[in-house]
């Protein structure tokens, strides 16, 4: 049985999700909705500065484009309620615009001739289940209509924090994500559409402090850590490839080797482990949602009290997209 997917919003995440779905048997994209001209969408699908050229053929046709011989309809509806997903057999919508990230807004895809399920590619709030695959995807029972795939940083932080908490117990902690610049920053100094004075500065020429909800949102993924973590972001001049540092106090004293052993034991398809001295360009395109770096683990002890730092890499584009697609595929399999 083939699960048919619709993508609303064909930006960075929408296009990369489309790429990954091409390699998954039993899942296919049959419709894309985006306000941009199909010629532009096709061009941006074919050519990608950070992720490389699309491995396949893309041809613009009337009403959409043809990818590897398969026609995908492209529409340009502003209101999700006006997208006739059912005509193209769409069962699950990947909501990737950023504008319909709350449950009530995302549910518009389910109205009229809509789809059956929605996966939001952003934090969705307290009234939807927030899923980080291979960390808490077992909270899904298939009856849900709208779920959230959290954020790219939460997908990096969550598996590392869970492994640390399961093994040693986290008391409290602060995280910092050293994050690639994104499309919501200016290329050159100029007014920021959201009024942010720092994101108004040239993204490729500055380290730009920014907020992140990833640490606080961890409670939606790992309830035992609710209220125990906080954090911030520093946007840096790289186009993709980010890293998260987590500094915590634990319930018990530990060694660097014990921490690394626990992380290695917890590794899986979503949570990688490396002892190589890598840099940010080395993780561009990786499919791990989080890649733990054992070379950066630190334990500081003063008067018997310890402070622990752990570090994990992520491609804030592809790592996150890979996790979203894993979640979507699983959600489709258990759907009721």
Curated annotation (Swiss-Prot):
List, alphabetically, the Pfam families matched: Gp_dh_C, Gp_dh_N
Q: What is its EC number?
A: 1.2.1.12
Positions binding NAD(+) in this chain are 12-13, 34, 78, 121, 316
What keyword terms does UniProt attach to this protein? Cytoplasm, Glycolysis, NAD, Nucleotide-binding, Oxidoreductase
Compartment(s) of residence: Cytoplasm
According to the lineage, what is the superkingdom? Bacteria
Q: Where is this site: Activates thiol group during catalysis?
A: 179
The answer on whether this UniProt entry bears the keyword Nucleotide-binding reads yes
Cite a GO CC annotation. cytoplasm
Q: Where does D-glyceraldehyde 3-phosphate bind?
A: 151-153, 182, 199, 212-213, 235
Q: Which InterPro entries match?
A: GlycerAld/Erythrose_P_DH, GlycerAld_3-P_DH_AS, GlycerAld_3-P_DH_cat, GlycerAld_3-P_DH_NAD(P)-bd, Glyceraldehyde-3-P_DH_1, NAD(P)-bd_dom_sf
**What does this protein's UniProt record list under function?**
Catalyzes the oxidative phosphorylation of glyceraldehyde 3-phosphate (G3P) to 1,3-bisphosphoglycerate (BPG) using the cofactor NAD. The first reaction step involves the formation of a hemiacetal intermediate between G3P and a cysteine residue, and this hemiacetal intermediate is then oxidized to a thioester, with concomitant reduction of NAD to NADH. The reduced NADH is then exchanged with the second NAD, and the thioester is attacked by a nucleophilic inorganic phosphate to produce BPG.
Supply the NCBIfam families for this chain: GAPDH-I
Identify this protein by name. Answer: Glyceraldehyde-3-phosphate dehydrogenase
Q: Which organism is it from?
A: Streptococcus pyogenes serotype M18 (strain MGAS8232)
* Gene name tied to this protein: gap
């Amino acid at each position: 049985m083939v699960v048919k997917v619709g993508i609303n919003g064909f930006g960075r995440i929408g296009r990369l999700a489309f790429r990954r779905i091409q390699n998954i048997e039993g899942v296919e994209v049959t419709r894309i909705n985006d306000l941009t001209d199909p010629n532009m969408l096709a061009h941006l699908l074919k050519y990608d500065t950070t992720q490389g050229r699309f491995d396949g053929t893309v041809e613009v046709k009337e009403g959409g484009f043809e990818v590897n011989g398969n026609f995908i309809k492209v529409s340009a509806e502003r209101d999700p309620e006006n997208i006739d997903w059912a005509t193209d057999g769409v069962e699950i919508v990947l909501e990737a615009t950023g504008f319909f990230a709350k449950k009530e807004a995302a549910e518009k895809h389910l109205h009229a001739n809509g789809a059956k399920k929605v996966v939001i590619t952003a934090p969705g709030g307290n009234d939807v289940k927030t899923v980080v695959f291979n960390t808490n995807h077992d909270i899904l029972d298939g009856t849900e209509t709208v779920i959230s795939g959290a954020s790219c940083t939460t997908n990096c932080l969550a598996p590392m924090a869970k492994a640390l908490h399961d093994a040693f117990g986290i008391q409290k902690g602060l995280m910092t994500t050293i994050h690639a610049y994104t499309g919501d920053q200016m290329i050159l100094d100029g007014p920021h559409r959201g009024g942010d004075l720092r994101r108004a500065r040239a993204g490729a020429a500055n380290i730009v402090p920014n907020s992140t909800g990833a640490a606080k949102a961890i409670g939606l993924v790992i309830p035992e850590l609710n209220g125990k973590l906080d954090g911030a972001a520093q946007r840096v001049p790289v186009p993709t490839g980010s890293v998260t540092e987590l500094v915590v106090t634990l319930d018990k004293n530990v060694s660097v080797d014990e921490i690394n052993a626990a992380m290695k034991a917890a590794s899986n398809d979503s949570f990688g482990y490396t002892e190589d001295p890598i840099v940010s360009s080395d993780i561009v395109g990786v499919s791990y949602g989080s890649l733990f770096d054992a070379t950066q683990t630190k334990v500081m002890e003063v008067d018997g009290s310890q402070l622990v730092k752990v570090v994990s890499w992520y491609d804030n584009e592809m790592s996150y997209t890979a996790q979203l697609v894993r979640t979507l595929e699983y959600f489709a399999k258990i759907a009721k």
